[in-house]
C-alpha cells in the first residue's frame, strides 16, 4: 500500500472506517466509496482531483482488494488495503477455508462465553484475541492487546453495551449464509423432505456419531431460529435450545438422535 498509510494504527483505522461507513451497515459502498477514494487521493497528495481520476483509482484498488467482487468494501478488505501488516490484526480472522458451518461457530462461541451469559464481554474478547495471536505464533504486548480489544468492541458492538452478541461475533468471523436457507420444506413432497432431512442432519452431525450434541445442537438451533427471527441473541439461543431438547430428546441423554429429530419433524428417516 502507498506510503501515506504506512503509519496507520488500529485506532486510526477505526476512525477512517467509522467516517466512511456513514450508514453503519458494515460496508463502504456507493457514495461512501467515492468519498473514500477522494480522501485517499488527497492523502496521497494528488492535485486537481476529478471524478475521472477518482474512478480510475477506485477501479485500480477495487480490482485488487474487493475479494468478494460485490462492488463494496468490507472491513477486512479495507484493512488489507490501508493497514500495514504488523498492525492488521484483522488478518487473524482469515481462515484457510470460509466459516460455513454454524457448528464450528458455536464451538467458538461456547468456548469464549466463559460465564455462559449469552454475551462475549471485553475480557472474554481479549482472551479470544490472545489465543488467536498464540495460534498465529505472534508476540503481542498487553497494551497492544488492550488496544485491539477496544478497537474490536468499537467496530462490532453496534449497540454500544460493551459486549458482543451472537450477531457481532458472526460478523467478526464472517460466518457464511445460513445453511438451511437453501431448503424449502413447506413446498416439498414427503420424499424430498426425507432427502433434505438426510442432507441437513449430515451437515450438523459434524462428529458423525448419528446424534447432535453440544455445539452441533447449538448450530442447528441457531440456523433454524434465524429462519424466522434473523437476529437472535445468545440468551434466546439457550432458551430455544432447551425447548428443542425438551421436545426431541426422548431418552434424555442430552443429545438429539437422528431418529428423535426425524420424529420431531414428522419424518421417518432412511435406515
From Swiss-Prot:
It is found in: Cytoplasm. Ca(2+) 4 binds at residues 205, 207, 209, 216. The keyword Cytoplasm applies. Ca(2+) 2 binds at residues 113, 115, 117, 124. Keywords: Calcium, Cytoplasm, Metal-binding, Repeat. Ca(2+) 3 binds at residues 159, 161, 163, 168. GO terms for cellular component: cytoplasm. CDD domains: EFh_HEF_SCGN. It comes from the Eukaryota. Residues 8-43, 52-88, 100-135, 144-179, 192-227, 235-271 form the EF-hand domain. Ca(2+) 1 binds at residues 21, 23, 25, 27, 32. It holds the Pfam family EF-hand_5. Ca(2+) 5 binds at residues 249, 251, 253, 255, 260. GO terms for molecular function: calcium ion binding. The keyword Nucleotide-binding does not apply. This is Secretagogin. It comes from Xenopus tropicalis (Western clawed frog).
Amino acid at each position: 500500500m502507498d506510503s501515506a498509510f504506512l503509519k496507520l494504527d488500529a485506532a486510526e483505522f477505526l476512525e477512517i472506517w467509522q467516517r466512511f461507513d456513514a450508514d453503519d451497515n458494515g460496508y463502504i459502498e456507493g457514495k461512501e466509496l467515492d468519498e473514500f477514494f477522494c480522501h485517499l487521493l488527497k492523502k496521497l497528495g494528488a492535485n486537481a482531483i476529478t471524478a475521472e481520476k477518482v474512478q480510475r483509482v477506485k477501479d485500480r484498488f477495487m480490482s485488487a482488494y474487493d475479494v468478494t467482487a460485490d462492488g463494496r468494501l468490507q472491513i477486512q478488505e479495507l484493512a488489507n488495503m490501508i493497514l500495514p501488516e504488523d498492525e492488521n490484526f484483522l488478518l487473524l480472522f482469515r481462515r484457510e477455508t470460509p466459516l460455513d458451518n454454524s457448528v464450528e461457530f458455536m464451538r467458538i462461541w461456547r468456548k469464549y462465553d466463559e460465564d455462559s451469559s449469552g454475551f462475549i464481554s471485553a475480557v472474554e474478547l481479549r482472551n479470544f484475541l490472545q489465543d488467536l495471536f498464540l495460534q498465529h505464533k505472534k508476540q503481542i504486548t498487553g497494551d497492544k492487546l488492550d488496544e485491539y480489544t477496544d478497537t474490536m468492541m468499537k467496530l462490532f458492538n453496534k449497540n454500544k453495551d460493551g459486549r458482543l452478541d451472537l450477531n457481532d461475533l458472526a460478523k467478526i468471523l464472517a460466518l457464511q449464509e445460513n445453511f438451511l436457507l437453501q431448503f424449502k420444506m413447506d413446498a416439498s413432497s414427503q420424499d424430498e423432505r426425507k432427502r433434505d432431512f438426510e442432507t441437513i442432519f449430515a451437515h450438523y452431525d459434524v462428529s458423525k456419531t448419528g446424534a447432535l450434541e453440544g455445539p452441533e445442537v447449538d448450530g442447528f438451533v441457531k440456523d433454524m431460529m434465524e429462519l424466522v427471527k434473523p437476529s437472535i441473541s445468545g440468551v434466546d439461543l439457550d432458551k430455544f435450545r432447551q425447548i428443542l431438547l425438551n421436545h426431541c430428546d426422548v431418552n434424555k441423554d442430552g443429545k438429539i438422535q437422528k431418529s428423535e429429530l426425524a420424529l420431531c419433524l414428522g419424518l421417518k428417516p432412511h435406515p
